[in-house]
């Protein structure tokens, strides 16, 4: 398969090197377009008010891989690859392997998930891979699973356009509890901002915060609760696969809102 790989940790991150090299090793045609520096938590931002530069990078990846380092965001990287750098469209867009999990509502901030989301915006099935640790450099389990999942999709293509958000526990292979199909959970934080004072007496804020245990979800969910959330399944050391889509319409509430009789609203 022809595969485009990106990330938000940057061109020098071990996660993307492990993923790209692992896929090339089993015969896939791999292209890498990723940020030239750390771009974590940039969400789906695009660069609009300055030029985007992309340079071919050698010696970082397997010789079979063509790679570019891009000055833009993760979403920029995928968009630039699809419309300017690659001669033909890839079969899959992959993002990762991220250094740290992307679970629950944190996915809205994730540059990794957003890079993969840009793939399905352009009608290409996508996968985001994340390792459940910010410090671990053991990517072998994650790479092995990525190889297996890509092989599965190659032999049995997804029946609908979707993004698979995959999180792998940062534990030994023997400690993995299994693989679960999950729904998106909820992550909440306390003490989100630290208020500090600089040497000149000016107040500034540093985004910090402590993750709470998974909190209660919004009621009246359309998704069956027989599926574990990604947050709880990862806590139990399962590899999680959560299908995502870019359409955020709350479908079940369309009929309810129609009862508002909005024709009677004033707008002048």
Swiss-Prot record:
Binds 1 divalent metal cation per subunit. It is an enzyme of class 3 (hydrolase). Its main location: cytoplasm. One of its GO terms (molecular function) is metal ion binding. GO terms for cellular component: cytoplasm. Its cofactor is a divalent metal cation. A divalent metal cation binds at residues 8-9, 40, 98. Signal peptide: none annotated. Keywords: Cytoplasm, Hydrolase, Metal-binding, Nucleotide-binding. It catalyses: a ribonucleoside 5'-phosphate + H2O = a ribonucleoside + phosphate. Its EC number is 3.1.3.5. Gene3D superfamilies: Survival protein SurE-like phosphatase/nucleotidase. Pfam families: SurE (PF01975). Transmembrane segments: none annotated. It is found in: Cytoplasm. PANTHER family: 5'-NUCLEOTIDASE SURE (PTHR30457), 5'_3'-NUCLEOTIDASE SURE (PTHR30457:SF12). Belongs to the SurE nucleotidase family. Nucleotidase that shows phosphatase activity on nucleoside 5'-monophosphates. This is 5'-nucleotidase SurE. It comes from Trichodesmium erythraeum (strain IMS101). The gene is surE.
């Amino acid at each position: 398969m022809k595969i485009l790989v990106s990330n938000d940790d940057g061109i020098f991150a071990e996660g993307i090197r492990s993923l790209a090299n692992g896929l090339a090793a089993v015969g896939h045609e791999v292209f890498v377009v990723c940020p030239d520096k750390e771009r974590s938590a940039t969400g789906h931002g695009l660069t609009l008010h300055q030029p985007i530069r992309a340079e071919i990078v050698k010696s970082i990846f397997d010789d079979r891989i063509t790679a570019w380092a891009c000055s833009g965001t993760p979403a920029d990287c995928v968009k630039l690859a699809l419309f300017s750098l690659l001669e033909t469209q890839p079969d899959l867009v992959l993002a990762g392997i991220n250094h740290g999990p992307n679970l629950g509502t944190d996915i809205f901030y994730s540059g990794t998930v957003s890079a993969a989301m840009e793939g399905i915006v352009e009608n290409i099935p996508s996968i985001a891979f994340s390792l459940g640790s910010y410090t671990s450099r053991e990517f072998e389990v994650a790479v092995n699973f990525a190889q297996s999942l890509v092989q599965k999709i190659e032999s049995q293509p997804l029946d609908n356009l979707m993004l698979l958000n995959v999180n792998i526990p940062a534990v030994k292979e023997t400690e993995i509890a299994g693989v679960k199909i999950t729904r998106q959970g909820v992550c909440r934080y306390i003490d989100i901002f630290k208020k500090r004072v600089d040497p000149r007496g000016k107040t500034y804020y540093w985004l910090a915060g402590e993750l709470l245990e998974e909190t209660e979800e919004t009621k009246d969910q359309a998704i069956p609760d027989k599926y574990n959330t990604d947050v709880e399944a990862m806590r139990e050391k399962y590899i999680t696969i959560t299908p995502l889509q870019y359409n955020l319409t709350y479908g079940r509430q369309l009929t309810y809102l129609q009862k508002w009789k909005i024709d009677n609203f004033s707008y002048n």
